[in-house]
């Protein structure tokens, strides 16, 4: 499949690298106004250009990883030269109905919400699409399954998916940073503290994904009566650990919905 990504920022580049590394038999083009910072992608067999229309007529799918305010300008530029291309949008807040309206209901459309872990084959990419475009969406679902997981969800949950899956990357990293800072305070150098904190989160996530149990069941394995784990957890909860995370996620969702 030939994939044309418009928007060579962090997300677009992550998707391109993920496809190049983990998905077979695909050709990728990435466009960006200033290509100096993405020239290195050519080392992975990825074509780069500052022209959004470069190679686009050969593409099977066009992926939009641009800002909301850029959508109208980009569509005005590319629609005259693409025919029957599937348009997959990763634009925050752009509904399928809005995208169909902007494209005069003439193109198959899919809504995707990957995250920047795509370049490591670890993205949680939520996908939604109109039922009539199921066949068009199928290869896109397969593509993003190569880059991690790709659950198909009801579009009404896409804003929530943005917060949980995309913003969630930053939330997880902030937890790791806090653990790193605590590690320094209790005696580790910064590099060692970071390595321990990051690997611990990776291990916890791997256990959860492979055993497919509720997180609390795994927590119970770590905690012992009067042990150091339970007193630490209780202290965190007394200071609003879970509630602050929940409030943060809900606040992010409110920001998206305006």
Give the role of each language-model region.
Residues 198-258:
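NAD(P)-dependent Rossmann-like dehydrogenase/reductase catalytic/cofactor-binding core
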Residues 109, 158-163, 215-219:
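Short pre-catalytic strand/loop immediately N-terminal to key active-site residues, enriched for Gly-Thr
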Residues 1-50, 54-56, 122-123, 184-185:
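NAD(P)+-binding Rossmann beta1-loop-alpha1 motif at the extreme N-terminus of oxidoreductases
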Residues 28, 38, 55, 71, ...:
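Small-residue helix-packing motif on alpha-helices
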Residues 15, 35-38, 44, 50-127:
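Rossmann-like NAD(P)(H) cofactor-binding subdomain of soluble oxidoreductases
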Residues 4-6, 23, 48-50, 55-58, ...:
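Non-catalytic terminal and connector segments of soluble metabolic enzymes
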Residues 98-108, 124-160, 171-210, 255:
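Internal alpha-helical scaffold of NAD(P)-dependent oxidoreductase catalytic cores
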């Amino acid at each position: 499949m030939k994939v044309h990504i418009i928007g060579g920022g962090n997300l677009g580049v992550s998707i391109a690298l993920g496809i190049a590394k983990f998905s077979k038999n695909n050709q990728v083009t990435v466009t960006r106004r200033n290509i100096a910072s993405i020239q290195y992608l050519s080392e992975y067999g990825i074509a780069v250009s500052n022209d959004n229309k470069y190679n686009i007529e050969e593409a099977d799918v066009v992926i939009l990883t641009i800002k909301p305010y850029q959508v109208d300008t980009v569509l005005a530029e590319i629609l005259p030269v693409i025919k029957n291309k599937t348009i997959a949008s990763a634009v925050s807040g752009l509904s399928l109905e809005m995208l169909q309206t902007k494209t005069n209901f003439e193109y198959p459309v899919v809504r995707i919400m990957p995250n920047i872990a795509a370049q490591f084959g670890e993205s949680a990419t939520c996908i939604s699409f109109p039922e009539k475009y199921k066949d068009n969406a199928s290869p896109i679902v397969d593509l993003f399954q190569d880059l991690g997981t790709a659950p198909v969800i009801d579009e009404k949950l896409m804003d929530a998916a943005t917060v949980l899956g995309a913003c969630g990357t930053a939330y997880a990293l902030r937890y790791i940073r806090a653990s790193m800072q605590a590690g320094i305070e209790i005696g580790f150098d910064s590099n060692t503290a970071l390595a321990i904190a990051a690997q611990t989160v990776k291990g916890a996530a791997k256990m959860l994904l492979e055993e497919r149990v509720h997180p609390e069941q795994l927590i119970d394995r770590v905690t012992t009566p009067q042990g150091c784990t339970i007193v630490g957890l209780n202290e965190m909860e007394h200071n609003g650990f879970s509630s602050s995370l929940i409030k943060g996620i809900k606040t992010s969702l409110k920001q998206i919905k305006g």
